Amino acid sequence: MANLLRSFGAKPFLTDCNTLYSGRRSNAVEHLQSAMENGFNPISAQCQVIIADGVKGTDYREIPIDGEYCPTPKIGTAIADADIIISMNHFKGHEQTGFGGALKNLGMGCASVGGKLELHASSQPKIDTGNSIGC
């Protein structure tokens, strides 16, 4: 795919943003190592792998959109700077949505760490103090 895109003058790269949760994909150094171990590397993919929101997930752009829940999503800079996005993905189980596919992969995969935090903010527990016994 990368070679085909290059034949049209494109500069293809594989990308992802760091995760909100701790682990090997929460920083770009270990994220790249994990990607390489899973076969996503310049040799097998014939293009570079770039962690779009930088080393610690703080490299992003706020993109104004007309969204009710997220009016200015924080998008990894490398993704925001891309001329075109070609999404190649698979389905996978997700505990809240049932399945994750193209929309989930683009929505969460393009969001920086801060963007993911904002997207998950609505799932925070809420306390009804009227029903609380103060335990």
Short names for language-model regions:
Residues M1-C135:
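N-terminal and secondary-structure boundary signal
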